[in-house]
A protein has these predicted regions:
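Catalytic histidine neighborhood in serine/cysteine hydrolases
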Residues: 267-298
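Short alpha-helix in the alpha/beta-hydrolase fold that links the catalytic acid
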Residues: 236, 242, 256-266, 289
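Alpha/beta-hydrolase active-site loop
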Residues: 120-146, 150, 167, 176-194, ...
Length: 332
């Protein structure tokens, strides 16, 4: 469905309802380990004057390059799904910034709405590395780094971003499990994609586990419809010690609940909460579509009859603030 994501990216901006509290925003680019640009959006508390601003495919009232307000600020990094972009969780980033967090979201080189040309194995290997590269920048080079509480780093990942998060917090894929699962459940969404044949090859399963980059700086994670979760080595999952919150949809046929969220619930030792969202489809976890996008009847904009995506997203954002406030507090 990558073409749907690309099409959504060029639709009219979505204007997000604002509440009290000023938010600053910075847009910049840093190189990954191969020199390709990683696009970043950074939201943070600010006392500077705000103005309506277009940020890619969304519009928000923010203080572009405004001064940072506060010290010892916790940070949450956002990881988009396949062929996404840094604005995919822009409303969540805004809400977290208003609540006193720094929120940073990246666009993954080789797996985004403009360029998804990397091969699937390379994408899955690169994503955790690029995530760590962003954390390196934020904590070592970003001009606002002295405002951060560097021991309070959270992660949010959707779909392929959920896979990225599982690797980052210590999980190791065992690709021998992939063809076994797909043979038993061929209707699993990722088993029907073109990449399934690649991930089922013996040479993929034989790749060394040392290729997967973990990042111990992440202290709490929210994983939403985490893709390929059933292919993770249970023993590696059992060693993950940080708190994790899991979300999935009862009508998600791309990343079905039981074989992914349910699988992780069985093996992760510190699952704080599991949310099986009634009537939610895979794309129900993305921000609400603009009217122009909905008029095109895109699958990415389609929800079950009666499912209120706007109300659900507001509830999800409130929970993100609650979870990260609770689990990132160093004095809890």
């Amino acid at each position: 469905m990558k073409w749907l994501l690309r099409l959504l990216a060029i639709t009219l901006p979505i204007f997000i309802a604002e509440s009290a509290g000023a938010v600053g925003f910075q847009y910049l680019s840093i190189p990954d380990d191969t020199g390709r640009p990683i696009e970043l959006g950074i939201w943070y508390p600010s006392n500077s004057i705000t103005a309506p601003t277009t940020l890619g495919d969304v519009a928000q009232t923010v203080a572009v390059n405004g001064e940072i307000a506060g010290d010892h600020l916790p940070m949450v990094i956002f990881s988009h799904g396949s062929a996404g972009r840094f604005t995919d969780r822009s409303e969540s980033a805004l809400v977290l910034a208003k609540a006193g967090f720094v929120a940073v979201s990246l666009t993954y080189p080789g797996d985004n709405y403009k360029d998804s040309g990397d091969k699937v194995v390379q994408i899955l290997l690169n994503r955790p590395r690029q995530t760590s590269r962003v954390l390196d920048y934020m904590m070592q080079t970003w001009p606002g780094r002295d405002h951060l509480e560097k021991s309070e780093i959270g992660f949010y990942g959707f779909s392929a971003g959920g896979f990225t998060g599982l690797v980052a917090i210590g999980g190791t894929p065992d690709w021998k499990l992939f063809p076994v699962h797909c043979a038993a459940d061929p209707l699993e969404g990722v088993c029907q994609q073109g990449s399934a044949a690649v991930l089922s090859r013996p040479q993929v399963a034989a790749r060394p586990v040392s290729e997967w980059q973990h990042d111990a700086r992440i202290k709490a994670a929210v994983l939403v419809s985490p893709g390929w979760a059933f292919s993770f080595d249970p023993s590696s999952l059992s060693k993950i010690k940080i708190p994790v919150e899991l979300w999935g949809g009862s009508e998600d046929h791309v990343v079905p609940f039981e074989s992914n969220v349910g699988y992780l619930q069985r093996y992760l030792p510190h699952v704080i909460a599991v949310h099986d969202v009634k009537d939610a489809r895979h794309y129900s976890f993305l921000k609400p579509c603009s009217e122009a996008a909905r008029a095109l009847n895109l699958e990415i904009c389609s929800d079950q009859p009666g499912f209120d995506r706007v109300a659900f997203q507001e509830s999800l954002n409130r929970d993100l603030v609650r979870f990260f406030r609770s689990e990132l507090a160093t004095d809890k």
